Amino acid sequence: MTLPNTPLPSRDLAGRVAVVTGGSSGIGLATADLLLARGAAVALCGRDAGRLEAARAHLRQRHPDAAIDARPVDVLEAERVRAWATEVEAALGPVSMLVNNAGQGRVSTFADTTDDAWQEELRLKFFSILHPTRAFLPQLARQAAALGDAAVVCVNSLLARQPEPHMVATSAARAGVVNLVRSMATEFAPQGVRVNGILVGLIDSGQWRRRFDARADRSQDWTAWSGALARDKKIPLQRLGRPDEAAQALVFLACPASSYTTGAHLDVSGGHSRHA
C-alpha cells in the first residue's frame, strides 16, 4: 500500500516499544509506520511471510534508522505468541504499547452460518486479542511501573454496535470484544495498563480495492467509485476512511496522550454510526 506523505510528527515515543499484530498491510502497516515516525521501536507480525517481508522492507525504506522487528506469527497459536513475546523483548526491549489488529470479517447470515463457522469466527475475534495480551501483559505491567503508562488497543468494528444481518457471526463477536475490552480495562487498571479499542467503519482496504477492480462502470476512477459507495452507505463524510486515519486513533489510545482513558471505544467511521 502507499502511505501518505504527511509531515513528520514529533518523536515523542522515543524509548518506547510497540507491538502491532496483523502488521503487514492496511491499518496495521499504517499504525506501525506512524509509531516509527514518532520514534518508537516496533515489532510487527503477520501470517504471510512474503507480505510481512515486503512490509518490513517498506518500513525500513521510510525509516532507515528505526528499530523494526518483523516475524511470521499466527496469533491463534498460543505457544508461538508466547515465544514471540520473548523474542520481541530480547530484540527491542520490554513492550509498553500493544495494538491487537488481526482478524477479518465473515460474510454470512444466520441461516447459512454453520456451527463450525460460528466457532471459527468467535475463536478468531477473541483469541487474536487474548493470546497477545496474555503474552505481553507482564512486559506491559513492568513498563507501566517504569514509565507511568502502558496500553493495549484493539481494532474493533462498528458492527459491534451496529450489526449487519449479512455478517451475523462477525457482528456478534465484535459486540463481545467491546465487553472484553471493558473487562480487561478494569482488571488491568491496578497494574497501570490501559485497554481501549476503536470502532472502524468502511476503510479503504484490499477488499474494497478488489471490488473496485471488478466494477461494472469502467469509466469511474477510485475516487468516484468509492465516493458513490460511501454515499450509498449514507456515510456523512461521503468517502471511505484511510488506514492512516484509523492509525492516528490507535496511536493516540496507545500513547500517554490518552493516559486517563481506559475501557473506551473511539468511533472512526466518518459519522456512519447510528448508535447512541
Give residue spans per PLM region:
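Alpha-helical segment proximal to the catalytic Tyr-Lys
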Residues: 138, 186-190, 259
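Conserved glycine-rich cofactor-binding loop
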Residues: 17, 24-25
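Residue(s) in the substrate-gating loop at a strand-loop-helix junction
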Residues: 157
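Short, small/polar-rich loop/turn modules that mediate ligand/substrate recognition or access, typified
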Residues: 99, 189, 194, 261-263
